[in-house]
From Swiss-Prot:
It catalyses: pyridoxal + ATP = pyridoxal 5'-phosphate + ADP + H(+). One of its GO terms (biological process) is pyridoxal 5'-phosphate salvage. Pyridoxal kinase involved in the salvage pathway of pyridoxal 5'-phosphate (PLP). Catalyzes the phosphorylation of pyridoxal to PLP. PANTHER family: PYRIDOXAL KINASE. Homodimer. GO terms for molecular function: ATP binding; magnesium ion binding; pyridoxal kinase activity. ATP binds at D114, E151, K184, R211, P212, L213, L214. Its EC number is 2.7.1.35. It is an enzyme of class 2 (transferase). Keywords: ATP-binding, Kinase, Magnesium, Nucleotide-binding, Transferase. This is Pyridoxal kinase PdxY. GO terms for cellular component: cytosol. The keyword Hydrolase does not apply.
């Protein structure tokens, strides 16, 4: 029997709705990965509602929880770590400590960093110390980096002038350590307004993917978290990076179609679960170069 992968997901959690782990854990489980959720915050709901209740996990608790898993002899079974929203740079350093601990007992373990800073339509949402930490420390340890356009701009200190400029910016991040950069949401002058575009960049090649842009009265939250989680899950299940990229785009589109059909502000993950596991649509990633 083929072994089921195990993944430690360290990011935010909401009681109501879908953001952070609340957007990523169930879909990753649904495609066949055992997920160990470690919630960096627990809020009543995501912050785009304008009000919420809850608390942030103290940074020192992250390595304590990792050591608790080690104490029962299970840490070596962790195949990957996913990190998302950070409340502080101290919390980020605690996560990197956990990643290092896991890689020490399982050198093959992967680390995907979703460098959450904000959304292009909503602005930056983290303190400057978090942005600095992500660029100066997290990127170097990440096997996979999954920024959106705002985060790519922040890393590179400028906005792109074209699709090929986005490609060059993403490639520049490879020099800092990651084996692959997945840009979850491209935005550049001349981009077609009816398309949603993504980019996958590795040392061996680069691929561009375009899918239809679906209209919503209010953009659902958690799409980036869903994207990063599914991409890492599919890699753990044996997909090539390109195949994982294509699968992720299709599965996320299926969720958005169901969400749109239900006129819902929150992602309709449960209703779309079969199509997450078995997308009906397919979007081809096209090789791209200078």
């Amino acid at each position: 029997m083929k072994r089921t992968p195990h993944l430690l997901a360290i990011q935010s959690h909401v009681v109501f709705g879908h953001a952070g782990n609340s957007a990523a854990v169930f879909p990753m489980q649904r495609v066949g990965v055992n997920v160990w959720p470690l919630n960096t915050v627990q809020f009543s709901n995501h912050t785009q509602y304008g009000q919420w209740a809850g608390e942030v996990l103290a940074p020192q608790q992250i390595p304590e929880l990792v050591e608790g898993i080690a104490a029962i002899g299970e840490l070596g079974n962790c195949d990957a770590v996913l990190s998302g929203y950070l409340g502080s740079a101290a919390q980020g350093r605690a996560i990197l400590s956990g990643v290092a601990r896991i890689k020490a007992v399982n050198p093959k373990a992967l680390y995907l960093c979703d460098p959450v800073m904000g959304h292009p339509e909503k602005g930056c949402s983290v303190p400057a110390e978090v942005s600095d930490f992500l660029l100066d420390e997290a990127v170097a340890m990440a096997d996979f980096l999954c920024p959106n356009q705002l985060e790519l701009d922040s890393f590179c200190g400028r906005k792109p002038q074209s699709l090929f400029d986005c490609l060059g910016m993403a490639r520049s991040l490879l020099d800092k350590g990651p084996r692959a950069v997945l840009v979850k949401h491209l935005d550049y002058p001349g981009k077609l307004v009816d398309g949603f575009e993504m980019l996958l960049v590795t040392a061996d090649g680069s691929w561009h993917l375009r899918r239809p842009l679906l209209a919503f009265p209010r953009q659902p939250v958690g799409v980036g978290d869903l994207t990063s989680g599914l991409f890492l899950a599919r890699v753990l299940l044996g997909d090539s990076l390109v195949a994982a990229f294509e699968f992720t785009a299709a599965a996320v589109h299926e969720v958005l179609l169901e969400t749109q059909a239900c006129a819902s502000y929150e992602l309709e993950l449960v209703r779309a679960q079969d199509r997450i596991a078995h997308p009906r649509v397919r979007f081809e990633a096209t090789p791209i170069g200078f």
